[in-house]
């Protein structure tokens, strides 16, 4: 017997279906469900009197014969490849299948088998994204990691040794000793971690030593001297050992101009940090490098998006982070040379057209580690308000724009650093690093974070309450944060050479270590939905930025969404 249900009631029961639209947080961004993999009338849902019961939606199939460990039911997936409604099956800590869950004995077209060994996470009315990847971490304090996890970040790549003066300014873990100790410290944390060695050496032997010790990449930073010579030697080593090079270029143009840096890079793949320049880089025109096909350009979140407060807060941040002295005029001039309203405004638009590909934090070194996702979608909102729908979108939804922006914090940083085989998207076979959001809190506060197939973080009420929901409700660590579960649910990224040299055993590591790969043969065209290559020019007098001859300019935003109303404490 069939039963007809109206769309509103259906959405309230099973979540939105194809054609339904959802607002993201309090932004002007609207997404529309493109496809529904579930079957009307055959949906699975857990609860008293619901479907997932023995002989109904739950089959007799054992885990050994194919039942999954966990099913996330009726979730609205937002990923670079689509915005779809589906069940998601997890097994052995990985994404097993995306599609339709249930009991194949009584239901058709089941590709995710629910058995008595299957746990259920209710995804109805929730958005599911891949865990975000932050590739610009200054490992200044370990407390960053919990803050990042609480925001939906599950992978952190960067450098540092703690609150050392060098780490406060640069994302480098210099030398084999420090790399070893940081890799060992990663055993304590419930996220995926990887560490960059210091790339500033014209002696390649020093660089080989660091990558062989376990560095998953190398970082060139102007505070250590980013000269044409160090750029060349660093890229030579990276090409030999297949690791990524990240670069913070020469703000003062002491060793050359942006053209000299481009010449030293010589067409080799490189990840440029804070490519606009406020975070550092050739003044005033480092931004033009985003038009090079071998350059993987990223932003850091202090300039995301351009608001009325952006310029004012930057000077003090710069002075602290780069060990400058406000009593020295040259230090003030150095800081002021990096802060340009014209290039920051252009950065918004370059993100919106897909010319800038990645957004990261620059944690505690001008950036805020817990705001990567928030700042990304604040930028998307600002561009929607100021520029209207993208050509690929319509007045009905912002699907393409949302997919473009989610790519900047998930799949694109994964591709850039050679870890997309493992993380970065919701795709079969990848590690089950997933984030579940209430739409009203999207990009601000996750409802639940799954790490390696186990729940690692969740909104949770009073532990002494009779049910989970009484206040105070806030994000808290869950069981995958502890003991052996932590060690089995998260991973450490190393160079391929380090794994071949048996570094995990030499350092007595218990976490599984994964090798980065395919970092040298990629280019910007490999990045998803963010691979435009405009010809960028910068007026040296006015700092105005032009893309293919068109002036890129926008006004600062007076008020941003996803902000104070979500953070009352």
UniProtKB/Swiss-Prot annotation:
The prosthetic group or cofactor this protein requires is: Ni cation
Query: Which Gene Ontology BP annotations are present?
Result: urea catabolic process
Catalyses:
urea + 2 H2O + H(+) = hydrogencarbonate + 2 NH4(+)
Its Gene Ontology molecular function terms? nickel cation binding; urease activity
The entry's active site is 322
- Post-translational events: Carboxylation allows a single lysine to coordinate two nickel ions.
Pathway stated in the Swiss-Prot or TrEMBL entry: Nitrogen metabolism; urea degradation; CO(2) and NH(3) from urea (urease route): step 1/1
Q: What is its EC number?
A: 3.5.1.5
Provide details of activity as a function of temperature. Answer: Optimum temperature is 55 degrees Celsius.
Q: What is this protein called?
A: Urease subunit alpha
Q: Which organism is this entry from?
A: Prochlorococcus marinus subsp. pastoris (strain PCC 9511)
Starting at the broadest rank, the lineage of the source organism is: Bacteria, Bacillati, Cyanobacteriota, Cyanophyceae, Synechococcales
């Amino acid at each position: 017997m069939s039963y007809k249900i109206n769309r509103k009631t259906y959405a309230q029961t099973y979540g939105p279906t194809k054609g339904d639209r959802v607002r993201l947080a309090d932004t002007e961004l609207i997404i529309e469900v493109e496809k529904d993999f579930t079957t009307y009338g055959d949906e699975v849902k857990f609860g008293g009197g619901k479907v997932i019961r023995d002989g109904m939606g739950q089959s007799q199939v054992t885990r050994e014969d194919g039942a999954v460990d966990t099913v996330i039911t009726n979730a609205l997936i937002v990923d670079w490849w689509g915005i779809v409604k589906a069940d998601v099956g997890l097994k052995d800590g990985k994404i097993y299948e995306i599609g339709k869950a249930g009991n194949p004995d009584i239901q058709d077209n089941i590709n995710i088998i629910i058995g008595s060994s299957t746990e259920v996470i209710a995804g109805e009315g929730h958005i599911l994204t891949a865990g975000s990847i932050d590739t610009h971490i200054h490992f200044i304090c370990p407390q960053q990691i919990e803050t990042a996890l609480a925001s939906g970040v599950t992978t952190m790549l960067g450098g540092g040794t703690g609150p050392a003066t060098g780490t406060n300014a640069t994302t480098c873990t210099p030398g084999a000793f420090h790399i070893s100790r940081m890799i060992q410290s990663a055993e304590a944390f419930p996220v995926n971690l990887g560490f960059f060695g210091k790339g500033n050496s014209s002696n390649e032997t020093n660089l080989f030593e660091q990558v062989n010790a376990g560095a998953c990449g190398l970082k060139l930073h102007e505070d250590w001297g980013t000269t044409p010579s160090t750029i060349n030697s660093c890229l030579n080593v990276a090409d030999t050992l297949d690791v990524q090079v990240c670069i913070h270029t020469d703000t003062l143009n002491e060793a050359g101009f942006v053209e000299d840096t481009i010449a030293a890079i010589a067409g080799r793949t490189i990840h440029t940090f804070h490519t606009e320049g406020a975070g550092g880089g050739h003044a005033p025109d480092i931004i033009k490098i985003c038009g090079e096909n071998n350059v993987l350009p990223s932003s850091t979140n202090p300039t995301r998006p351009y608001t009325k407060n952006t310029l004012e807060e930057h000077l003090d941040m710069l002075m602290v982070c780069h060990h400058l002295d406000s009593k020295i005029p040259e230090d003030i001039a150095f800081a002021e040379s990096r802060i340009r309203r014209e290039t920051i405004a252009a950065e918004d638009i370059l993100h919106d057209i897909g010319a800038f590909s990645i957004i990261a934090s620059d944690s505690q070194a001008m950036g805020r580690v817990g705001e990567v996702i928030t700042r990304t979608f604040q930028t998307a909102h600002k561009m929607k308000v100021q520029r209207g729908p993208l050509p690929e979108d319509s007045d009905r939804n912002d699907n393409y724009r949302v997919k473009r922006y989610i790519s900047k914090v998930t799949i694109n940083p994964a591709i850039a650093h050679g870890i997309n085989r493992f993380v970065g998207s919701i795709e079969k076979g990848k590690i089950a690093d997933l984030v579940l959001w209430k739409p009203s809190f999207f990009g601000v506060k996750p409802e639940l974070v799954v790490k390696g197939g186990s729940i690692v973080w969740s909104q949770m009420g009073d532990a002494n309450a009779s049910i989970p929901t009484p206040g105070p409700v806030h994000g808290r660590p869950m069981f995958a944060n502890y003991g052996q579960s932590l060690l089995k649910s998260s991973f450490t990224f190393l160079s391929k050479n380090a794994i071949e040299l048996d570094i995990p055993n030499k350092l007595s590591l218990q976490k599984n270590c994964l090798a980065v790969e395919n970092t040298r043969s990629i280019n910007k065209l490999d990045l998803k939905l963010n691979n435009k290559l405009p010809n960028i020019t910068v007026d040296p007098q006015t700092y105005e930025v032009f893309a293919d001859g068109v002036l890129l300019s926008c006004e600062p935003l007076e008020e941003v969404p996803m902000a104070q109303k979500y953070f009352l404490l």
